[in-house]
A protein has these predicted regions:
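Conserved donor-binding/catalytic core segment of Leloir-type glycosyltransferases
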Residues: 4, 186-214, 222
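An aromatic- and histidine-rich active-site surface loop
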Residues: 69-80, 85-114, 118
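Membrane-proximal helix-turn-helix segments that form the acceptor-binding/catalytic region
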Residues: 77, 128-145, 237
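Nucleotide-sugar donor phosphate/pyrophosphate-binding loop at the beta->alpha transition
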Residues: 108, 118-137, 173, 177
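Nucleotide-activated donor-binding/catalytic signature segment of Leloir-type glycosyltransferases, i.e.
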Residues: 234-254
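Aromatic "clamp/platform" in nucleotide-sugar-dependent glycosyltransferases that forms part
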Residues: 271
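Short hydrophobic beta-strand element within catalytic cores of glycosyltransferases
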Residues: 288-291
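Conserved acidic donor-binding segment of nucleotide-sugar-dependent glycosyltransferases
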Residues: 306-314, 322-328
């Protein structure tokens, strides 16, 4: 099969969609398939081969509201004019508005739903309206629809009366790293609480910073993440944070692996999710995790961690204080969290599901 993924920031880069495409695409190449990945020009990514995948850089309008949708448009045009593929795989609800175009050339299309975009607080009324309408294109334009969580699958099936294929994101089996690079930041094993996500409002870093500020602890709070077009929000976080909070920006590679390997506690206070790869990775490294009690997080957690009431800083503060005082509660969840994600979210299992779906569409 020849499969095209439309569209993402680039490879290799951090980020949920980027990691998913890299893990799935590279494994499909190993199984004898050809993979094209359309990427943005804004992230200094080189065109050419990466892990056997053909990376193509297409133009995009570099503004918050038009960047992604223009990238998808130009990528789809390139696909129709320059390439011959069997499957066109569109990432996320917004890009689905162009998923009917490959069908005009007889190309099978898939739209993968990563979350309810219209719920994200960063969008104004125009953006929310666009994404609410895009739900319809995601449901009705492609040949097949997939969702990264059972919560999303049930939502779209009930709302639109369609069949949605549940295919989650995944993780690899890993070996934890001993402290090395993190020592340069004054960090060591069990000396910090970790937040590792994009710094956008719906990920909830502001709840965590506000709660952490009220605690009396010698542990640090490490904020590992960044986001495009979010300077005002990021600056507001830095202004709120106390001296025990470290902002490391976008972190990848060995440093990120060390941060996951040595954290005392991982916290995800997100208001909305599809299925958080960062959460799965934290559990995969054997971390105790504390997450907001939204349905998508509860699904991923499945009892192998702790929760607090969504958007409730006081409840988050209460749980942080409890887990800082009770290391036995922290230690109690570590191994079960790791075992849970390896049994249910391993990438090899996920790629089997994609390969089976793609093959069924060509019969």
């Amino acid at each position: 099969m020849r499969i095209a993924y439309i569209a993402l920031k680039g490879m290799p880069l951090g980020g949920g969609i980027e990691n998913l495409t890299e893990q799935v695409g590279s494994r499909l190449v190993e199984r004898g398939h050809e993979v094209i990945v359309y990427c943005s020009p804004q992230y200094n990514i080189r065109p050419g081969k990466y892990k056997g995948m053909d990376i193509k850089i297409l133009p995009a309008i570099n503004t918050k509201n038009l960047h992604k949708i223009s990238l998808v448009f130009f990528s789809t045009l390139h696909l129709l004019i320059k390439e011959k593929v069997d499957i066109a795989h569109f990432h996320a609800v917004g890009p689905s508005i162009f998923s009917f175009l490959p069908r005009l050339k007889g190309i099978k299309t898939v739209v993968q739903i990563h979350g309810l975009e219209w719920k994200r607080p960063k969008w104004g009324i125009i953006g929310k309206t666009f994404f609410m309408l895009s739900d319809y294109s995601a449901a009705y334009f492609p040949h097949k629809v997939t969702a990264v969580s059972r919560v999303l699958k049930e939502y779209y099936e009930q709302k639109f009366g369609i069949n949605v294929h549940y295919i989650p994101t995944g993780i690899n089996e890993i070996n934890s790293r001993v402290p090395n690079k993190i020592l340069e930041y004054g960090l060591n094993k069990d000396t910090y609480i970790l937040f590792a996500c994009r710094l956008v409002p719906d990920k909830g870093a502001h709840y965590l910073i506000n709660a952490f500020n009220e605690l009396k602890t010698d542990k640090k709070l490490v904020i590992a993440g960044d986001a495009a077009y979010a300077d005002n929000y990021i600056n507001s976080l830095k202004q709120k944070a106390n001296k025990n909070t470290l902002f490391l920006g976008l972190v990848t590679g060995e440093l990120l692996e060390e941060l996951f390997s040595n954290a005392y506690l991982y916290v995800l206070p997100s208001e909305i999710e599809g299925l958080s790869i960062s959460l799965l990775e934290a559990m995969n490294y054997g971390n105790c995790v504390l997450v907001s009690d939204i349905p998508e997080n509860l699904e991923a957690l499945n009892g192998h961690g702790y929760t607090f009431a969504n958007k409730d800083t006081k409840d988050l503060q209460r749980m942080l204080r409890l887990l800082l005082e009770r290391k036995d509660l922290v230690d109690d969840k570590k191994e079960s969290a790791k075992k849970h994600v390896l049994e249910n979210y391993h990438w090899d299992k996920i790629v089997d599901m994609y390969e089976e779906l793609y093959s069924s569409m060509l019969k």
